[in-house]
Amino acid sequence: LVAVGGVGMVALGANAVGCSGKPLGIVAIGSGNDFARGLDLPVNRVETAVEGIVGAIVRGTHIDVDMGLVTSLPDGHAIDSTDGTDVSQSRSPIDRYYAGMLSCGLDASINDRANHSHLPNGSLRYFAAVIVELTHMKSCGYHIKATLADGSVEERDIISPLLTVANSRHIGGGIEVSPYSRFADGLLDLVWLDHVPNFRECVDAVARAYHGRLLGSHAFGWKRVRDIEITRATEGDEPPVLMADGEYVGHLPV
């Protein structure tokens, strides 16, 4: 299967092949192309990408990569992946793969705003959404139960504007939110903000994100996890709609 497009099209391809073992070729011509960028695939170079795919088919070669799988817990439900509306009155369960990141907070709000922006596709649209959303951040309430990389289990509340479960390093056309993520390590990276940052911290975080040094900021927390449950905490604001790979996913708990 060959997916031609941006992050959303790659997400469709990833869900089509799932864990079937079928190879997925990517011709990255979208606005973000974060998954392709993370794999060092050609970006916005159609002929080069097609030649690479044909060569891989002829040689019978491929690389194995991890995907995240998000499923709903009781009371969690899916929404339409294209516009964020409820799928049906029956509240369908969430059951989908994602290649890049599951966005649960500020990152999801930024993605939603970028999706509805009238600016041209690309990094400018996402950067503008970042600036707008940073001006009215909320501290959302999450309760997490995570199996960490060493097999231990951690359970706690996180009251934070941002919570991301990352499989890849980049989001939004090159912003490196999770610099330690690797595509074939069997792990996900949980990244969050420890508190609502002030203006100076926001400027510092944005600058660091565009230069691959985000987790050097004291405002961020980070854990490597094998799996995680995310529910609504009793404190904090209501989290926004979850998004993954630029597509709408659904509502907590997952």
Which sequence ranges carry the predicted segments?
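Glycine-rich phosphate/pyrophosphate-binding beta-alpha loops
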Residues: S103, D107, T164-Y180, Y248
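Short Gly/Thr/Asp-enriched flexible loops that form oxyanion-binding sites at enzyme active sites
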Residues: L1, M9-K22
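Short amphipathic alpha-helical segments
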Residues: G13-V17, R37-L39, E176-V177
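Hydrophobic/aromatic beta-strand patches that form the interior of the parallel beta-sheet core
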Residues: V2, G25-V27, V191
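Catalytic core of DAGKc-family lipid kinases
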Residues: C19-P23, V27-P161
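Hydrophobic structural packing positions in well-ordered secondary structure
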Residues: V7-V10, A28, I110, L163, ...
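Helix N-cap/beta->alpha junction signal
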Residues: G5-G6, S103
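ATP/nucleoside-binding phosphotransfer catalytic cores, i.e., glycine-rich phosphate-binding loops
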Residues: A146-D157, E176-L188, W192-V254
